[in-house]
A protein has these predicted regions:
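Active-site cofactor/cluster-binding pocket
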Residues: 1-199
Length: 199
């Protein structure tokens, strides 16, 4: 896992790119993570990249987090972290684009079968079966909330209780209380089941 002292690196900011498909919640995952960072006392920026807005189309969302005011307003081309919400995207697009070998990738994957698709990436890779967890807890393949649990596992600056509070805020007008609780359960399960790929 990444120690709190190393989170922002030399540039003083953590830049995260979420890659998913329409309907998987990449945009809301970015928004919730930004809320978590803000509630934790950090400066934030969060913005989606709009493309074809249809279910199944690739979707990107970006978050910048820093312990000092963020003065840049450019798009994120060289993220520190890439979060992939659909493993099949490793077969159709370059999910490592702009990610250096010092970077981190977090994948929604059942096992390590994705490795040959991204063998050019030499950084740290973490994975969790976010889709399986979502299906088991909320009954639908919407892996965005389990992925937040994986991010908390990799980056201890993001606390589970703060993530759950942010989810409650985000979903209280959209989901039933029962479904919100199931999403919180999904976050916790993913936190405990996230694994690092061993080279």
């Amino acid at each position: 896992m990444i120690s709190n002292s190393n989170v922002f690196g030399n540039k003083g900011v953590l830049e995260i790119k979420f890659i998913g498909r329409g309907g998987l919640g990449a945009k809301s995952a970015g928004e919730i993570l930004a809320t978590v960072a803000f509630k934790s006392g950090f400066y934030i920026q969060a913005f989606p990249e709009y493309g074809a807005e249809r279910t199944g189309a690739p979707v990107k969302s970006f978050v910048r987090i820093s312990n000092r005011e963020i003065r840049t307003h450019t798009s994120i081309t060289n993220p520190d972290v890439v979060v992939v919400l659909d493993q099949t995207l490793t077969e159709s697009i370059n999910v490592t684009e702009g990610l250096s070998n010092e970077g981190i990738m977090i994948l929604n994957a059942k096992d390590e079968n994705f490795k040959e698709k991204i063998d050019n990436f030499k950084g740290r890779i973490f994975f969790v079966d976010a889709s399986g967890i979502a299906l088991k807890t909320i009954g639908r393949n919407i892996p965005n909330t389990p992925v937040l649990g994986a991010i908390a596992r990799v980056f201890p600056i993001f606390k589970l209780d703060v993530i759950k509070d942010a989810m409650e805020e985000e979903f209280k007008m959209k989901l039933s209380k029962d479904l919100i609780e199931k999403n919180k359960e999904a976050v916790e399960i993913a936190y405990n089941e996230t694994r690092e790929v061993k080279n």
